[in-house]
Amino acid sequence: MTKLLVGLGNPGDKYFETKHNVGFMLIDQLAKKQNVTFTHDKIFQADLASFFLNGEKIYLVKPTTFMNESGKAVHALLTYYGLDIDDLLIIYDDLDMEVGKIRLRAKGSAGGHNGIKSIIQHIGTQVFNRVKIGIGRPKNGMSVVHHVLSKFDRDDYIGILQSVDKVDDSVNYYLQEKNFEKTMQRYNG
C-alpha cells in the first residue's frame, strides 16, 4: 500500500511561512521527523520525499505548480502510482476557521480555496480525505489575497505551531490506524 500526503502552498522563499503555506509547513514537519529530504521532480511538478511506515510507502508532496494549479501534481501522482482516492490526504489552510483550529473531513466543496478547487477539477471528485488548518479571516479591511499571502503575527504563529503539532499527531494516528473515519472521530472532538 502507498499513501500520498499533500501539503498545499506556494513554492519559493517569498511565500515561506505565509498563511497560505501551512500545508507546506506540516509536510516539512513530517519530513523532519522522518529524517527525509525533498527532491524536485519536474515531471510531477512537485517536491517529493518518501519513507516507509509499517510496510507502507508514504509520499510527502509539495506541489510546485503554485496553489491554483495544485490539482495537476496531485492527479499526475495518483495516476502514475495507480493510487485510489482513499490513498490521498490533502493538508491546507482554511480562512473560515479560527487560527490554529483543525478539522478533518472526508469530503466537501472547495469552499473558495483555489488549491482545493484545482484538485477537485483534476481528480473529478470532492470525496477525498483532508485536514484543514484555520488561518482566520482578514482583519481591518485587508483583502483576502493580502491576508493569505502574509506571514502570521507572533501570537498567531504560536497557535499555528501548536496546530501543526496536533495535525502531525492526527496524520501519524491515521497512518498507524489506516482508518480516516476513526481519525476524524478522535481529532475533530
Swiss-Prot record:
It comes from the Bacteria. GO terms for cellular component: cytoplasm. The record marks 93 as: Stabilizes the basic form of H active site to accept a proton. It is found in: Cytoplasm. SUPFAM superfamilies: Peptidyl-tRNA hydrolase-like. The record marks 10 as: Discriminates between blocked and unblocked aminoacyl-tRNA. Transmembrane segments: none annotated. It is an enzyme of class 3 (hydrolase). CDD domains: PTH. PROSITE patterns: PEPT_TRNA_HYDROL_1, PEPT_TRNA_HYDROL_2. Pfam families: Pept_tRNA_hydro. One of its GO terms (molecular function) is peptidyl-tRNA hydrolase activity. It catalyses: an N-acyl-L-alpha-aminoacyl-tRNA + H2O = an N-acyl-L-amino acid + a tRNA + H(+). Gene3D superfamilies: Peptidyl-tRNA hydrolase. Its main location: cytoplasm. Its EC number is 3.1.1.29. The keyword RNA-binding applies. Monomer. Belongs to the PTH family. This is Peptidyl-tRNA hydrolase. It comes from Streptococcus pneumoniae serotype 4 (strain ATCC BAA-334 / TIGR4). The lineage of its organism: Bacteria, Bacillati, Bacillota, Bacilli, Lactobacillales.
